[in-house]
Amino acid sequence: MGLLQGQLTHALACRHCSSITCLHSPGNLAILVLFMVWQIRRWWQLRGWQQLQPWCSGDKMTQGKGLQLLYHLAFFDCLWKQKSEEEEKEEKECLSLNPLKPYHLSKDTPIGNGFSTAPPHPSCRSEGRPRATETQEQVLIQSPSPSRSFPTFQTLTNLPVRSKRASGSSPQQTKLQLFSGLPSLYNESLKTIFLSSDGPSPLKLSICPSVFLNKVPFPPAYNLLLPCYHSSTYYPTPEAHILEDLEEIAPGSQLVQSPPSPPIPLVSSNLKPLLKGYKRIIPDTEVHTQWFTQNKEVPSVSENQGLYPQPELQKFRSSTFLYSSEVWRKRPGDLRLHQHNPELPFAFLLYPFNPQEVLDRFEMPWRNMKQNEHPKASETAMPTASPLPISLTECQRVNPTGDLSQVKTLCQTTVQKENLQIYELPISAPCQLTVPVTEGTGPPGTPPGYEAQWGILAYKGIPQASDPLMPASCHPSGSLSKVKNVNPKERLSAPKDVRENLGYREHPHVSKSPVSAPSPPLDTLSDYQRENPPEDGSGFKPQWECKETSGSPWASETPTLDFHVGFYEATPMCVPLGSEAQLKGTPSTENLCVYADIVSSPSLPSVSLPDFAIMGPQRILLESKALWETKEQKKHLWTSDSSCPHKTPLAPFIGPKRINTVDDVPRSEATGKNTDNTKKCSSSEPPFLNLNPSPALVQQPLRVSPIENPLKSKAWCGHIQRKNNFLASELPAQSLSQHLLEPSPEGVLSDVEPAGGFMKNKNHCVSASPVWECSPSPNSVLKFHISEPSGDQCNCTPKESVAEWTKDSWANELPGSSFFSALSQEPHSETELVCRNVLEREASQGPNPPAVNPPQPTAWPIQPGLSEAKAEAPSSQGEAVSEVSDHPVIHAWQWSRQLKLRLNKLQQSPTFKSPGSHHSFSSSPVLNLTLESWGPSSCSQQMHPLSLHPCSSSSHPPKVQRAEALPVQAPHCLHSSSQPQAQASGRAEQRSQKSKRLKRKAMVQIPSPGLGHVKADENCSGMGEPSDTGLLVSGKRQDKTLVLLSTQKRGSSRKSKAEKCGRTARLGSPTNTRENNPAQACRPAEASMPRFSRKFEHKAQSSPHSALAQQLLPNAAGPQDRPRTGLVAGETQNPCPFKCCPWIPTKQQLSSLSQEAPPTRGFQKLIDKFLGVHRPLPTKSSP
């Protein structure tokens, strides 16, 4: 067993690499194990050669007693250690009788004791290794005697069995080596073979195995499959093994009776058996070899090959083969054309597999055929559904040099009976991607032979007047009727010439014709052009003037897009036409074919092109025309004066954005510039709108494209502008917000739309900013407004929006805050946050009024409808605030009346009068002014209390005097009042006590912190602007801030009272709370407040003008002035501590006023009355 194992190990080693794991090693481990088991079993069963022979005889094999699998093993002969001379003689006789027995080259190798004395050779043979001339190789055939069973083995295994016989005195013992036809390497004995590391691979299968069936070689012509190799070169590759095997078999093999032919490549040996049955293709086997070799070596044709004739392909001598292959190539769906050509299955090898080639030669013509399917398709031999359509280069390949008549016939047969050659089809198709303009002019990435696929559009100087055959790039396959007259023999000398003749040299695009001849119905176009070859494409202009009727300038512009090859490969043919201008930033292409209109939208899948193309060109034209007109109408819908811009169809708004996001920025900027005239903006985008196939197709990716929101916002802006400052109109704030937020078809842009509309009202088309998210939160909406800079352009970039927001004054934030309530279900929550933030900012800045940074605040131009506002604030921010405040949701004058009545009663009461020289409350100029300013006429002006007070940054008030304020702080709220500063320090104690009382009353009276403030602000907005005195009074609110901070701690228990007083003092309170201690006012709301809004508020507060104007002036004086007015009114009225939110400014204001030293004792008594405190007030406060 050990010896057998060692022999098997050596036998399994590869002859070349001496590796057992090599694929060309003698055998598999599994086979080896099976063989060993079988050998052991048989060895012990037979016990000798005499017993083994009958078992191995052919008779036994035929009986099925042997193991056929074991005969496949290469080391079966290693088991035979002895053979008698009888066996050897019988073998000789068998070989002499066999007509196919191999001749013996020599018999020089002596054999002793049945074993060869040849020394072992290295595992891998070298150049200098002795050849088989020293030994004889025999392919043994089954001998007549039963002792020779290996022919039967050969029959079963199809393995050439060779025996090595050497002449000598001793009887020769033929050692059958079943090494898959491999030579024995002069190892005459199995023992030597197995002991040496040079053992041939036992499992090496011959490429051309010898097949014998019971003494009869089969097939008889098998010798044709055995090429003769005499090369002594070493082949390291796996094929080398086979080659070497063949080389060593060939010298002694008689199977090859014909004289050795010139060396044939290995590929031919592998493929020739397949070609045996295909003699009709090309009788010459060498041609077959060359053909397959070319296909093997050149799997894909180069670009030049795709465009120009192939010298290699011209080697084919059989024109019928090429013709049939071309026909098969052209019409794969019609098998009748190539059923008689058995070579067609191999025809595909002639065509390139390069993706670029496939696209240019196959995909484009296929699309063209699909799109240009002629109504008379039944007449044409070229089916439109053919996945492998014809191409010009293919026609030239048939015989590019001279046999063009045949090509012409073939083209006429396969394409149309209208003399439209096959080569015309891909070129005549609309939006042909391969444009044969001057080489080198094409965009980078295109083959040298191929011109810019969109060179027609990219290069305007390309037109050649010498060839007006091609009116438009979007002609269907039947549109080139004039080309049919071209003689293919004359014009097909070169592919470039052919294309030029087909009309690519001149295009209406290049010629800048006002309207290119888009692809009309194929039947109509072909018929028309038969009589009138289109010279300039103007023949079909009437059909497509609908595209031009829109009056958009893009129609007259010549496209200048330069597309690279990769663009159109994944998109329909005409898509680049529709989107080229978009990508380049130009409005659209001059010649926008209907196909482009339908398919150009990127939202449409590329698969849609073949689908709709199948519908038929005429139907496409009709539908496309209708669609175009429909989109033309839709395009101007949202620019119309309709009251509801959100009712505008989605397609006009979103479609253009989806089609091209690259062009959105310039277009949005243009939109921002054209804020006054939205129609201009819309008219500048007609091609994009037209390209949008349908709202349904566009609606899906609405949230995907951030550009879409700006577009929608732009639409809103345009509508609002047409409404003549919709915000400035008489609509209440709530109605406005609801109107803006009213669910639109898009729905996604609802929250952005109000922002866009509001900004548009200020000649800003914030929607132009392409950086907006699809559905920004209310905070983002606020940022949207804030980011909007003053001026016509909307240069709001994603980063700029944040930066500008921080820089912008409260006036910018006003619209956002105003929309906070509308956007959020809780109107007062957001406004409270804003107001509280404002108050805190103001408080943090100290008693001095915050200074506004003039450069930072973005001025919002006053709309014509805002003339009502009498804002004294010079800054545009105040104006913006006034604009926002124009639409009061709740009339604040109702509150003002109640307050007025109460104040009058208090003034009349004896308690109201204070001892000393204190002026009565009514006598106070500030009070009077506030009462007057709070007239109902001014109430309508203030729309958005939130936005006005916290957001708007008022301009610098001309007169701002500091007055001593009484800080009466309600719990959790800062009561900012713009009253004169207190002169005596002793008033602090009184203020603290009063603040407590006021807080108690405020808690009782204030209904709800959030709503109270909103209402108060609204009321304040409705009130007229206060006089300068009011401004002076309000300007001193910062002094109150310090007092309020101290009083805030004390007045936590007065929440109930503050609530009671809330309504009465609401008008003035929001401003007071904001101005006194913004830091303390409504911190909970502040926490929920968006961070950016807080920043904005902080800046607004930092500016004293904004804070003052917001409080005093509702509209006329600006948001700063409205808060002041509110403060004055609140002070004059019953001061009540404001509890949690500045939005209930009345209570805060009252409390703050009571805490701060009022300008008159009457005012202090009024506060005392509300607080229930009856104490002498300090001396008269300084004016």
Curated annotation (Swiss-Prot):
<protein>
    <recommendedName>
        <fullName>Spermatogenesis-associated protein 31G1</fullName>
    </recommendedName>
</protein>
<feature type="region of interest" description="Disordered">
    <location>
        <begin position="109"/>
        <end position="153"/>
    </location>
</feature>
<feature type="compositionally biased region" description="Polar residues">
    <location>
        <begin position="671"/>
        <end position="685"/>
    </location>
</feature>
<feature type="region of interest" description="Disordered">
    <location>
        <begin position="469"/>
        <end position="555"/>
    </location>
</feature>
<feature type="compositionally biased region" description="Polar residues">
    <location>
        <begin position="1069"/>
        <end position="1079"/>
    </location>
</feature>
<feature type="region of interest" description="Disordered">
    <location>
        <begin position="661"/>
        <end position="686"/>
    </location>
</feature>
<feature type="compositionally biased region" description="Polar residues">
    <location>
        <begin position="135"/>
        <end position="153"/>
    </location>
</feature>
<feature type="compositionally biased region" description="Polar residues">
    <location>
        <begin position="975"/>
        <end position="984"/>
    </location>
</feature>
<dbReference type="InterPro" id="IPR026677">
    <property type="entry name" value="Spata31g1-like"/>
</dbReference>
<feature type="region of interest" description="Disordered">
    <location>
        <begin position="1048"/>
        <end position="1087"/>
    </location>
</feature>
<feature type="compositionally biased region" description="Basic and acidic residues">
    <location>
        <begin position="124"/>
        <end position="134"/>
    </location>
</feature>
<feature type="region of interest" description="Disordered">
    <location>
        <begin position="973"/>
        <end position="1032"/>
    </location>
</feature>
<feature type="compositionally biased region" description="Pro residues">
    <location>
        <begin position="847"/>
        <end position="858"/>
    </location>
</feature>
<comment type="function">
    <text>Dispensable for normal development and fertility.</text>
</comment>
<feature type="compositionally biased region" description="Basic and acidic residues">
    <location>
        <begin position="487"/>
        <end position="509"/>
    </location>
</feature>
<feature type="compositionally biased region" description="Basic residues">
    <location>
        <begin position="993"/>
        <end position="1002"/>
    </location>
</feature>
<feature type="region of interest" description="Disordered">
    <location>
        <begin position="843"/>
        <end position="884"/>
    </location>
</feature>
